[in-house]
Curated annotation (Swiss-Prot):
Disulfide bonds join 212-224. GO terms for molecular function: porin activity. With TolR probably plays a role in maintaining the position of the peptidoglycan cell wall in the periplasm. Acts as a porin with low permeability that allows slow penetration of small solutes; an internal gate slows down solute passage. The record marks 60 as: Part of salt bridge gating mechanism. This is Outer membrane protein A. GO terms for biological process: monoatomic ion transport. Residues 111-238 form the OmpA-like domain. Its main location: membrane. The lineage of its organism: Bacteria, Pseudomonadati, Pseudomonadota, Gammaproteobacteria, Enterobacterales. Keywords: Cell outer membrane, Disulfide bond, Ion transport, Membrane, Porin, Repeat, Transmembrane, Transmembrane beta strand, Transport. It holds the Pfam family OmpA. CDD domains: OmpA_C-like. NCBIfam families: PRK10808.1. Residues 104-109 are annotated as: 3 X 2 AA tandem repeats of A-P.
Amino acid sequence: LTAKLGYPITDDLDIYTRLGGMVWRADAKNNEGFKDHDTGVSPVFAGGVEYAITPEIATRLEYQWTNNIGDANTVGGRPDNGLLSVGVSYRFGQQEEAAPVVVAPAPAPEVQTKHFTLKSDVLFNFNKATLKPEGQQALDQMYSQLSNLDPKDGSVVVLGFTDRIGSDAYNQGLSEKRAQSVVDYLISKGIPSDKISARGMGESNPVTGNTCDNVKARAALIDCLAPDRRVEIEVKGI
């Protein structure tokens, strides 16, 4: 029985020593037919090199020396024993663990923003911020579209715009009231209040440009500037 102590030289090559003891039995017989035997324990010393061919299979070269086998009084001698050996060993349970499968993270979904535009003349009477019945019907259709988009993690922004008739301050206030009227109605239909907000844009960002600059009559100017009077709805995070 021996204990093995090893030291790695490279990843595949080790040197080692074994120290321990060996239980032996020695038998002797002389020319006259006299027989005798002896048993005992002797120290064992060994050293060698071991090379791993694969993680499971290794070959080794070893020299083992055993001190004082036998008893001169019984078997007629007390020799030492030296043994040079070459061997192959198989080590169980050395299979390499499979490398963990690295799963690439799923790409983040692309955040999109949808834009919708409603004519204020459909939603409101001129210079008013209270929804008309036909305006409510238009928003019912809009709510159905928003529900189909299902912006669970997104938000809805309602932007109110006016034309340039009137003062800047008045138009700013009117655009805010109109945007808020749309927000309140959509909340009543089921959009969470923390997912929707109103913003008044006043007479900014007109879509008519200078096409109405030469229109002087008030009624004709109101008709010409109708595209500027609008409500835009932005749905973010779809």
